Amino acid sequence: MSEHPLTLQSMIATILRFWSEQGCVIHQGYDLEVGAGTFNPATFLRALGPEPYKAAYVEPSRRPQDGRYGVHPNRLQNYHQLQVILKPVPENFLSLYTESLRAIGLDLRDHDIRFIHDDWENPTIGAWGLGWEVWLNGMEITQLTYFQAIGSKPLDTISGEITYGIERIAMYLQKKTSIYDVLWNDTLTYGQITQASEKAWSEYNFDYANTEMWFKHFEDFAEEALRTLKNGLSVPAYDFVIKASHAFNILDARGTISVTERTRYIARIRQLTRLVADSYVEWRASLNYPLLSLSSTSEPKETSESVVPMISSTEDLLLEIGSEELPATFVPIGIQQLESLARQVLTDHNIVYEGLEVLGSPRRLALLVKNVAPEVVQKAFEKKGPMLTSLFSPDGDVSPQGQQFFASQGVDISHYQDLSRHASLAIRTVNGSEYLFLLHPEIRLRTADILMQELPLLIQRMKFPKKMVWDNSGVEYARPIRWLVALYGEHILPITLGTIIASRNSFGHRQLDPRKISISSPQDYVETLRQACVVVSQKERRMIIEQGLRAHSSDTISAIPLPRLIEEATFLSEHPFVSCGQFSEQFCALPKELLIAEMVNHQKYFPTHETSSGAISNFFIVVCDNSPNDTIIEGNEKALTPRLTDGEFLFKQDLQTPLTTFIEKLKSVTYFEALGSLYDKVERLKAHQRVFSTFSSLAASEDLDIAIQYCKADLVSAVVNEFPELQGIMGEYYLKHANLPTASAVAVGEHLRHITMGQKLSTIGTLLSLLDRLDNLLACFILGLKPTSSHDPYALRRQSLEVLTLVSASRLPIDLASLLDRLADHFPSTIEEKVWDKSKTIHEILEFIWGRLKTFMGSLEFRKDEIAAVLIDSATKNPIEILDTAEALQLLKEEHTEKLAVITTTHNRLKKILSSLKLSMTSSPIEVLGDRESNFKQVLDAFPGFPKETSAHAFLEYFLSLADLSNDIQDFLNTVHIANDDGAIRNLRISLLLTAMDKFSLCHWESVAV
């Protein structure tokens, strides 16, 4: 970096000059309020259709909701984007971008440049693309995107967009911590020019904008866009769409558009942009696409090594797919896909090999196969065909069926005598009938030929969460493929994919060693890349990171264990370096969870905490992809400060907002459209509590009243709007700040956690969590939003397991069937003019929960037979009773095997007898009992009922008593003949057996493994 960094306007001039030299038209920013440079017609309209176009311009962008009254160091409602659009995308897209950074004085060897996954989309204009956020020492400075659709139209020709955050870059170059301190030119700062206006516009956008006027403007602009389109004027119509979009942004900032309405407004603007896009493409087509003559196409370049090699010995195989930076989450997916597909290809073609390994990093996926045989031998075999009589007529002519068969085999046969001319056909006699057999001789295929055909197909079959196209070849992959290495031993396999022919040339680390490198053989691959500063083994990179985290921890301060972040960091770097930075201690006063979210979600940093207290410390650990120096560390520290400042701003803003204001806002936030708002949900939870208190006295608590009242308040807070994963957690802080009961605050903080066994929750937190999940289950099942085998968008499976976990951990003795029946009364009986079936819905929910109960009991180490024995249709709907019954059965099996055998034997004997006998409808049981019947009835009458106390011990005692009863039953069965000729006596004895059988109804004893 030079001693005298560029002023903002000098930097802009330098970047524009760079792109002018690349052939870009230098536009001016558009003369309307746009939310981003993408809205400018030079991007939105020019990206449509097949015509090439290259442009660069500075776009003043208006985002009213991002205003911070001129006090935030780098968040503004009116800022600038330097936009570059390249259509079609050049092959050296990323290299051109990095060269533009060098032009403004950034020596990339001194910095940590990262390409972070960004699936960009703008729903308002129906635009989306795949690309990256570019981070400079932890600070996002640019967005790079390969557009895939604009105006909801898939693109004919892919455009590449570069959006420089020029204020942030200027802050970095000038070593400023606030945008307002940046030198605009040699005499004036950014703040002197814009800060007063920024404050004024924030006040207008948030506090004073005339919403009635802006609602009218929106309608007028939308109508004018439609009217203009009817006259075929797509360009003027688009201006009115831009105006409508800005009106919406003002209304959104004023908070006058609810969540439901917001979706509707966005959909309306998106519909308009689709109409504009269609109209614009039709208009350009009517002009015969005047710029199309400037386009060119790319074809694969033949090389001297484009001939398939002759391989005669066992050799190793290497396939490297070199691409622009893959998303960190895509690399492990690619590794799994490449390994699975490669094994499938090798197996399907009977290719012999000794071992297979797949390596992956951001810029490459590599397949290494050991000792691949040079040849595949397909052994000779015969295949039985049809009977000759079905193929030929008695005269020897081919029958219609024969014509069809021979055509399918590619054989020209018109008469029986023609068979002798074909060595691949033979006649065999099977069981006295003649059949035609197809003879397949031994075939030897070169492995190289198979790989030439299969490897390109393998790459195209790889599946990722999202794939893209980047040129006119139509090839799809997670990110643009820029090179292929395919070596069989020391020989090149010149496979072709799109415009690329494989070679032995790979590339080193983008910053540390960006040169082209030659791979001599698969055995040398890993070490050759290491010499070019690429650690291609993911296991080795992970080990480096884990060692670095330990090295930067101590007895007093250590990294907070975050396995997912370690995984992500492993696939964000090709040569990881671990270092440490710090931030101002003042931020440690913020909620710990907010600090962690800012560091992890936004910056990919590892937070640290004090080992003894668990309190967050002001040190963080960063994994770089370049050797850390003072510039890189200071840059990361400066990048974190604005993030924490923004978190602090949002948190303080929330603390200044009364909880009653949040509650009022819930009225405008839709829960489900058919079930009203989140406010309505809270009111329903209050009604649920009143019912629940009749099932458990614990629910009759003022602390629970307060927790329910405010449990959803933080959903409309500024912090949760930025970090949705902090909902509930922030609510706890806000309730404590409002001096509400600690028990209520803690419950709010607990109720949205993912709950697992062993996790401790407060009593109030347990009750609130349970009510919330039961309400969600009822709501979704009433609306028909039941999970499918592959789709569970509302996480109902998890919530059902959590219901069972909560009930089990707290031992709440509740009958879910009765409770759900009562809670269901708090929902409207008619949904969307249809009456929903209450009993059917509750049955479906119970069936769903019982399905999860099997999983839950399995996690508690109950055996399959024990689970099947207690989960019967007639079983109680009280999960605690079921779990206690299963535990008692488990104890019976382990400690009283003889008694268990008596029970099961007796049960099975009873069941067999009763299945063959029925009560006579013409005879009544006699009233005077014989001695044996009388004694047996006394035994049955004296037998204890089902346990009133819910505990495993009580159920075990019942089972032990049942074993004793079983002996009495056996004695009775051994001494009387049940099927007595006298119908009255037979009925009496059957009735006694039915009574006895009822004592066994707690379990399905046939399922128990004895």
Curated annotation (Swiss-Prot):
It comes from Chlamydia pneumoniae (Chlamydophila pneumoniae). It catalyses: tRNA(Gly) + glycine + ATP = glycyl-tRNA(Gly) + AMP + diphosphate. PROSITE patterns: AA_TRNA_LIGASE_II_GLYAB. InterPro entries: aa-tRNA-synth_II/BPL/LPL (IPR045864), Gly-tRNA-synth_bsu (IPR015944), Gly-tRNA-synth_heterodimer (IPR006194), Gly-tRNA_ligase_asu (IPR002310). The keyword Protein biosynthesis applies. Residues 1-312 are annotated as: Glycine--tRNA ligase alpha subunit. It is found in: Cytoplasm. GO terms for molecular function: ATP binding; glycine-tRNA ligase activity; protein dimerization activity. GO terms for biological process: glycyl-tRNA aminoacylation. The keyword RNA-binding does not apply. Residues 313-1010 are annotated as: Glycine--tRNA ligase beta subunit. Its EC number is 6.1.1.14. Its main location: cytoplasm. Gene3D superfamilies: Bira Bifunctional Protein, Domain 2 (3.30.930.10), Class II aaRS and biotin synthetases, domain 2 (1.20.58.180). Pfam families: tRNA-synt_2e, tRNA_synt_2f. The lineage of its organism: Bacteria, Pseudomonadati, Chlamydiota, Chlamydiia, Chlamydiales. One of its GO terms (cellular component) is cytosol. Belongs to the class-II aminoacyl-tRNA synthetase family. Disulfide bonds: none annotated. This is Glycine--tRNA ligase. Keywords: Aminoacyl-tRNA synthetase, ATP-binding, Cytoplasm, Ligase, Nucleotide-binding, Protein biosynthesis.
